[in-house]
């Protein structure tokens, strides 16, 4: 769905297209086949041309002492990098000689299904007794998808007194739009649900 001055229209997100070309059989809302055309590529600067000294100006992050495990939950939908984020944070913690565990819950998600990554960081591996973040124990929610964050399995991990939430407020179309062109995403209601479940919430796009 694309909201315009002339009402709601439809557009195709080519970045999430499957490459099996089933769209040409009529399963894509575009219903258009362009022959002989090429996608215009963006002009990018080669890495070799970048001024590497800009990274030298960045201060080193301050190491902190963790008295108890710090619990992070990364949430999103399949195909958007939730598992990758968990792996990056896990490796960064390992490089700092911290104890870390990463548990990915992908279920049957491939594209569009809910995905969670439970990340626990401690001063030492012996301080981590469970790899799953417990109920009301999340210190930080990194929400790549609002709908997933507002779901019951995620909200029960949040604590109104301690949880900090950083949420991507992009409204990814849900299944309801397939059957009902006028389906309401309910973004305002979803925001309120998340805010009521967190101590502090920051929405970014």
Regions found by a protein language model. Give the residues of each.
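Active-site cofactor/cluster-binding pocket
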Residues: 33-74, 80-205
């Amino acid at each position: 769905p694309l909201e315009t001055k002339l009402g709601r229209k439809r557009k195709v997100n080519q970045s999430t297209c499957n490459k099996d070309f089933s769209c040409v059989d009529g399963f894509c809302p575009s219903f258009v086949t362009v022959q002989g055309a090429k996608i215009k590529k963006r002009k990018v600067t080669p890495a070799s041309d970048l001024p590497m000294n800009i990274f030298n100006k960045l201060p080193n992050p301050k190491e902190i002492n963790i008295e108890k495990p710090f619990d992070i939950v990364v949430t999103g939908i399949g195909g958007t990098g939730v598992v990758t984020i968990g792996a990056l944070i896990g490796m960064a913690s390992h490089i700092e000689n911290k104890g870390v565990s990463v548990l990915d819950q992908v279920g049957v998600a491939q594209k569009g299904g809910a995905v969670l990554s439970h990340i626990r960081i401690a001063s030492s591996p012996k301080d981590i007794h469970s790899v799953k973040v417990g109920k009301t124990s999340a210190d930080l929610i990194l929400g790549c998808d609002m709908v997933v964050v507002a779901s019951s399995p995620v909200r029960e991990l949040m604590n109104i007194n301690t949880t900090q939430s950083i949420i991507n407020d992009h409204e990814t179309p849900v299944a309801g739009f397939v059957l009902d062109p006028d389906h309401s995403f309910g973004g305002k209601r979803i925001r309120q649900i998340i805010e009521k479940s967190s101590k502090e919430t920051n929405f970014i796009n």
